[in-house]
C-alpha cells in the first residue's frame, strides 16, 4: 500500500477543490481525507493500492476549473502511519 500526504497551495479554498478531490478519490475507491488548512492550503492524505493508482490520482490534482494550483508538496508516509480509514472524506 502507498500512503501519501499532499499539501496543495494556490487558489484551492472556496472553489470546490475539496469536493472535487473527494469525488475523484471515491470514484477510485481510495481511503483518506481532504481538508482546508488555516494557512490557505489544502491537505490530502490518501492510501493507494498500486503505484499506477497513485500516479493517476496525482495527474487529476490539477483541480477543477475554478481552482488554480500553484504548488503540490508530496510527502511519503511511513508504513506505520497511525491512522486508518474506511473511506475518503472531507474533514471540516
From Swiss-Prot:
What are its E.C. numbers? 3.6.1.7
Q: Where is the Acylphosphatase-like domain?
A: 3-92
Question: Which Pfam family, any one, appears in the UniProt record?
Answer: Acylphosphatase
All disulfide bonds of the chain are: none
Tell me which domain of life the UniProt entry assigns to the organism this sequence originates from.
Bacteria
**Entry annotation: catalytic residues:** 18, 36
What InterPro entries does the database record attribute to this sequence? Acylphosphatase, Acylphosphatase-like_dom, Acylphosphatase-like_dom_sf, Acylphosphatase_CS
Catalytic activity entry: an acyl phosphate + H2O = a carboxylate + phosphate + H(+)
Return the Gene3D superfamilies for the record. 3.30.70.100
Keyword annotations for this protein, in alphabetical order, are: Hydrolase, Plasmid
For this chain, one GO molecular function annotation is: acylphosphatase activity
Family the entry assigns: Belongs to the acylphosphatase family.
> What is this protein identified as?
Acylphosphatase
Can you name the source organism? Borreliella burgdorferi (strain ATCC 35210 / DSM 4680 / CIP 102532 / B31)
